[in-house]
Amino acid sequence: MVDIVDKALRMGEGRQIKKLEHVAEAVNKLEDQMVVMSDDELKGQTAKFKERLANGETLDDLMPEAFATVREVSKRTLGQRHFDVQLMGGAALHWGNIAEMKTGEGKTLVATLPSYLNALEGKGVHVITVNDYLASYQSELMGRIYRFLGMSVGCIVTGQKPAERRKQYNADITYGTNNEFGFDYLRDNMAWEKNELVQRGHHYAIVDEVDSILIDEARTPLIISGPAEGDVTRWYRQFAKLVLKLNRDEDYEVDEKKKTVGILDPGITKIEDYLGIDNLYEPSNTALIGYLNNAIKAKELFLRDRDYVVTGGEVLIVDEHTGRILPGRRYNEGLHQAIEAKENVEVKAENQTFATITLQNYFRMYDKLAGMTGTAETEAAEFMGTYKLGVLPIPPNKPMIRIDQDDLIFRTKKEKLAAIVKDVAARHRKGQPVLLGTASVESSEVVSSLLDVVEIPHKVLNAKQHEKEAAVVAVAGRKGAVTVATNMAGRGTDIMLGGNVEFLADAELKAKGYSPDDTPEEYEKLWPETLKKIKEQVKDEHEEVKKLGGLYVLGTERHESRRIDNQLRGRSGRQGDPGESRFYLSLEDDLMRLFNTQLVARVMAKGMPEGEPIESKSVSKGVRNAQKAVESRNFEIRKNVLKYDDVMNKQRTVIYSERQAVLKGEDIHEDIEAFISDTLTSYVRGAKNGSDKPADWDWNGLFKAVNDLYPTKVTIDEAKEAAEGLKGDKAVDAVVKLFVDDAEAQYEAFETKLGADGLRTLERRVVLAVLDRKWREHLYEMDYLKDGIGLRGMGQRDPLVEYQREGYQMYNQMIEAIKEETVQLLFHIDLDSIAQTNDDGTDSIDDAAVDSAEIKMGDDVSEDDELNKGNLSEHEPEEAARIDNHADELETAENIAAVKEAAEEGERIPESGLLGPEPMSHAEGKVPARKRPKSEELKTPWSDGRTFPGTPKNAPCPCGSGRKYKMCHGQNEQ
């Protein structure tokens, strides 16, 4: 099926390439005109282009001249002239495509063309790279072109303060990593003041190594979190010790493919004996099951120096695709704590999610998106389906002459490693540079130790030495160099035969104290001479290495993805240079062991002589099939992550847009009045007890609720009198009007006390406080709903449909809770404590006093919430790496009706938010009719009044709702 889609996507490829060639021809015709321009004339082009845009011309109209201008400026500042294929790549990016350009084709330089062109609109261009170093390096180097043309350049890196970030985002072109851009978006939607915002919109983005960021990283949501309540450290430590006493396959089972574990009956008995409990599955022990499962996962599925490293007493995750450390990122749902307990380091507190978004949904916000990579064609269908991005293969500037040798396959890892060392030694003796690619930190260290034994000098580049990355890669193409590196995917720095000229020149100038940011004039003056000197030094060595066969890439095992294998191979043979690549495999490699067990068993049974490689088409085919199986599985996981996040994305879009409106000063006084009316209406309707006769209503319960909401002056007798002789909606309307008139009269007095501006400020601050608190609680509940939703499949119900339906109900309940709590807060704040008289005699509010009052009220209203505006900034935001495992949940024919029903309900969420003129519905319950589920679905799981004494607050509720106990039946204990 995927092959058919790929063919369909490629049908118009030839026409697109012709169109790109026409752009290159148009630019070439302008080159003579640009060459004779003075520097000042070239600098003046930017103002002319902006004027033409203002007069109605389009970016497409300006493209040939703008590209020709950038090309000429690049020649004068960097000494680099854009090739025709680079012009084609620039046009592809401008039109919102992925330009597939092989390694060494100068993708970084290509990005300058569409970046400059689109920056002319003044809305900002974002260039996304894979790490902070590349963001800084590229913004400095390519920034010389932009600054020459009067454009400002920014760079977002880890550790910058908000004021500095805002300055960088306000630049015409801003470089940074995907995580920095994504987290800034989330932080902006947690800001409390307008001047705390740093981003200014999402106009146009160019994503470098787009497959790494939008495909490989797509399974990991960006999550800003903070410590949750309770200290459960002892449980993690206790279970880390207990699982050491359990035996695999006897006490528990492990599925390495799906990364799941399951406790068996003998294991349950042992755990119950160790803990001194009668039944592990009693409601009061439910939380212990989570600790047990995480401890087993930490023991069996997450290995040190493969999945993580321990540095400075911290467990740091290693990116499985690039081999880089992911600082600040933590596994979610207690798994990271289980690993910390296993490694006997400090177990940090569990986290609660404050804000989250997937990279898929973040990048889909951009008005225009484009990307560059050397390997995108294998994922063309996914790029089109998820991001509406076409893939255009750009022809190389020079033919690729690298020789890709057949794989050598050995029976055991020991035999494979011996053959690798022998091959490297032979290449090193003649001076050919060698790059060894490994799949993990552990593998790289094993290979390094074997090279030490035979005294082959080499450099190691893995998660433990990532600071040296660019420097190591820049010299990996020199004569005799041997480099051992974890996955080279997305490394970003080209391996040039003889050495990377630009990098070496830049490093020499910086060593002398010159940089394009701090000393731009001196740097520019010294650059041509330094570059020329380095080129001369490298030139002879470059030719010598070419004669030796170029860079030899040796893969020590196949990766799960063919695309990442191709990226490793692609480090050799750049710009028409010679090169060679080969992969060494063994039947003990994880890929073969887990995904092609029958083939492995068949080959092993043949009894091959030790040390002899297997050359078999069936084995090579088996490797490809194993990779396809993993790729297919990972694609399903990504699709399901997106499906589930799309539910949250609709809700997040509404909440964040309305939050921004409040933050930026929108007058919400009428909305507050609507909150009062809506909440009181829901109270009165809730008191009806299903009867239209006022005599049957719960008047005492109604007045208790109303008095908790605001200090009403209406009496029960007055309310009964208003409803006398009326029934149904008319009776409700009469009582509601009585309460609303009373509440609004009291509320109007606030304006007299605080002044109009003071009250508007107070309204905004309270709405933000309540919205943030309720949104965090909502994320918390949605997380737990998703964790348990897979079990619905056992009842022949589609888990995704159930998640959509229940998430939709929970969203509506959150909206009503925000209204209710906002009104309650506003009426209970001590106005005397926040009012102040200004020097001119006018009234206003004391901001600090408001903060204090809000926090106090927030604690009163929501006891479970530990974080509020007062201390949120004290907690460093953390990104939790979580892979959602819903890939195996498939729709069945029986679910078609449910799918339609969920679509009808779930798709309407973006139409209904917190702010707006719509009055409260007269339907039964608290939820407006335009978004209210069926009445029987309004019953909450805890409405039966049950409690489960002894259940920990943060444990899953024994009722099976999927919520934590404190958010479910635990509420009945209050």
From Swiss-Prot:
GO terms, biological process: intracellular protein transmembrane transport; protein import; protein targeting; protein transport by the Sec complex
Region Disordered, residue ranges: 855-880, 902-974
Record's bilayer topology term: Peripheral membrane protein
UniProt protein name: Protein translocase subunit SecA
Naturally occurring in which organism (per UniProt): Bifidobacterium animalis subsp. lactis (strain AD011)
CC cofactor note: May bind 1 zinc ion per subunit.
Cited SUPFAM superfamilies: Helical scaffold and wing domains of SecA (SSF81886), P-loop containing nucleoside triphosphate hydrolases (SSF52540), Pre-protein crosslinking domain of SecA (SSF81767)
Cofactor(s) the record lists: Zn(2+)
One Pfam family this sequence matches: P-loop_SecA
Catalytic activity of the protein: ATP + H2O + cellular proteinSide 1 = ADP + phosphate + cellular proteinSide 2
Keyword annotations: ATP-binding, Cell membrane, Cytoplasm, Membrane, Metal-binding, Nucleotide-binding, Protein transport, Translocase, Translocation, Transport, Zinc
GO cellular component: cell envelope Sec protein transport complex; cytosol; plasma membrane
Main location: membrane
EC number(s) from the headed UniProt entry: 7.4.2.8
A molecular-function term among this protein's GO annotations: protein-exporting ATPase activity
Keyword Repeat: no
